């Protein structure tokens, strides 16, 4: 995929509108996790250093076109300027007189954060008039928010039609990593898909079995597939009504020559709680009054062996109830094996999605993967093979 980056842009003394992701977690008016802010520093710092007037566009929360103090981006100014190590100006609107006055006052290298774009209904509607009102304050447009790229909103997609458009460094890193993961990967490719429910990942599974060489199914989802094969999963989380869908996916995988790897043994418990009494059983002998809470040792060995044969790995979703010890065992063991192979230079590893990031952090290996996407919805839609409007408009 070819797209325009900051290397293609002349930004000296230009007003550069930069779409960033500042939808950060807050508690009592304080930002509790700086990850998303840290990701956008390279783009902002580079533009400022090159003498651009840097104007940041972002949304926060879901205000549905109504301004409110709790959804104001003013709360982000302090942590942003601290992480940037650069003063950040703030405008109380993203369009109109207040925005224009703040932009007009900028000197080369200055950084300005405009108020929440979603305080205007035109943002989510991608309203042409709102797009023009935003564009009035910029000469160039840079999108550095892959996490919002699956939405065709004014600040994520509309602006790229009216201003010269470029990918920021965080966007560029994400797109290059994803290209290695599924776009044009080194083979064989193994995908790990876990999490609770098959119903939320049907599009994902259908896309992956056409693109990968082996698909590991774990977490609560695996129970639905085991049940579809006629096995008794006891009181485990299971979508019995999707048994025929699971069988269709397995049949399709045979025709696309994608090996499906399901657990062969399981750690079962009698209560959904940490440190509940537990025991390992083969998946063909799970007690009727127990529930599967993690994959067993034979299963993790099977997954590790598939990873040893792979050149590329894409991961979305944990292999068990990782938030409850000891049912984090399979997720941690496999994650550490992936990290080891990656560090040895034998594997390209891409992981993403909320629970996945939390699980890899829990295993202490998030920094050892080739790339971890914090994008959530956009990462999933990319894995599902769906078009991403905010990315498509950046292509050369």
Curated annotation (Swiss-Prot):
GO biological process assignments: gluconeogenesis; glycolytic process
Pathway given in the UniProt record: Carbohydrate degradation; glycolysis; pyruvate from D-glyceraldehyde 3-phosphate: step 2/5
EC number(s) per entry: 2.7.2.3
SUPFAM superfamilies: Phosphoglycerate kinase
UniProt xrefs under InterPro entries: Phosphoglycerate_kinase (IPR001576), Phosphoglycerate_kinase_CS (IPR015911), Phosphoglycerate_kinase_N (IPR015824), Phosphoglycerate_kinase_sf (IPR036043)
Subcellular compartments: Cytoplasm
Keyword ATP-binding: yes
Pfam family, one: PGK
One Gene Ontology cellular component annotation held by this UniProt entry: cytosol
Binding positions (ATP): 201, 323, 353-356
Ligand binding (substrate): 21-23, 36, 59-62, 118, 151
UniProt keyword annotation of Cytoplasm present: yes
Top EC group: transferase
Molecular function in Gene Ontology: ADP binding; ATP binding; phosphoglycerate kinase activity
Keywords in alphabetical order: ATP-binding, Cytoplasm, Glycolysis, Kinase, Nucleotide-binding, Transferase
Catalytic activity: (2R)-3-phosphoglycerate + ATP = (2R)-3-phospho-glyceroyl phosphate + ADP
Assembly and binders: Monomer.
PANTHER family per UniProt: PHOSPHOGLYCERATE KINASE (PTHR11406), PHOSPHOGLYCERATE KINASE 1, CHLOROPLASTIC-RELATED (PTHR11406:SF23)
Family the UniProt entry places it in: Belongs to the phosphoglycerate kinase family.
The protein's name: Phosphoglycerate kinase
Native source organism of the sequence: Brucella melitensis biotype 1 (strain ATCC 23456 / CCUG 17765 / NCTC 10094 / 16M)
Name of the encoding gene: pgk
